[in-house]
Amino acid sequence: YLSEIDKAAYHYSSKYYNWDAYNPDEIAKVREQVDRIAANPCDATASAEMVSVEIPVWRLRNGQKVAGTAHVQVLSSIANDVKEIFTEIYNGPEQFPIESVGGYNWRSNGLGSNHSSGTAIDINPDANPQIDVDGTTVLVGNKWEPGVNPYSIGRDSDVVKAFGKHGWNWGAGFSRADMMHFDY
C-alpha cells in the first residue's frame, strides 16, 4: 500500500509542533478532569465532563466549497482550544473541507483511548486511514491521497499546522499511522 515516499509522509513533521503551546494552568485543568474520569471510568462520568463545540467548516457541495458548521464533543477544558484550531483551519488559505469530525467516544477499554477522555479528534476518517504496523493493511478508512482527494490531510496542510501550533499530536507518526487523528 505505501511506497517508501508515502511511509516518510506518515511521520509527523515537527516543524509545526509548538512546544510553547503548553499552558501549565490549562494542562492542570485537563489533568483534573481526566483524573475524575479515571476514578470512575464509565460513559456517564466521562460524558459529564464533555461539551459540544460548534466549529466553522468548509463543506464541498457540487464541487464548490461552502461555509458551514459542525459540532464536536470534547473535554470542556479544551473547548476553547478546539474552537480556535478549527477557526484557524477555516480561515486558512487552503479552505480545507471537512466532511465529518468526531471527538469524544467512550470505548469499552475506558481510558485506553484519548477519545474516551474527549482529548482526541478524528477528521474525515474515510480519506485519512489508520494503517496497521505492517504499512499495508488499512484498519479504518480508505486510501490516503493528499493533493488528489480534497478530504485527505496533507503533512503540510492547514490542519496539521493549526493542531501543531496548539501543541496537539498528529496520529500520522503512530506505529499504526492514524492520519485522521489528533490528540491533546
Model-derived segments and spans:
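A broad, low-specificity signal for short, low-complexity segments enriched in glycine/proline
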Residues: Y10-N18, A79-Y90, P146
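Second-shell loop/turn segments in exported
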Residues: V66-S76, G110, W144-S152
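Catalytic cores and adjacent binding grooves of peptidoglycan-active enzymes
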Residues: L2-S3, S113-Y184
